[in-house]
Amino acid sequence: NNKDLECKCLIEPLSVKRIFRLQDYFENHSLPRIRIFNEAELIARRILQNYPPDLPVALSDEASVHLVLVGLGSVGQSILLQLARLGHYRSGKKPKVTIIDRNVKQQWREMVEAYPPLMTLVQVETQELRIEEVSESDVDRWLFDEKPVTMAYVCTKDEIANLRFARLLVNRIQARDSD
């Protein structure tokens, strides 16, 4: 009866959504009514909307965006993809992303295979580390890079480790400010 009815369909995990093909499950005339989504993608959109990566440098014609992204699971990957989609900032420079994860090199290769344009849309530096292995000197190197960090997103599934990393980050910023 309802000719305008649409169906939104959750497909998890993100790796399955990437390869999912609606046409394998529905007739062609039904395809316009079906939309698939993923929870990690919704979270990433909301995070970047509420906590824009360029907030500290939004009015600058020179400064560029530099994110620290801890965790390249579904949410981390979705943040990176959303950043690539939106990453056109006032300075005209492509955003730099320092990605920290224990298996980041393989995960990054898989992302680039799935989304080849990523290489041209973001500048990525990978750090093959578990979140618990990150040291003060690592944080200092990222914070005080030639492109200073503008935002950090900590996205591992271990909330205690996430909070410890956040505390380390804040402590290093405060230590530098007091020098």
Ranges and model annotations:
Residues 1-179:
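Cytosolic regulatory regions of ion transport systems
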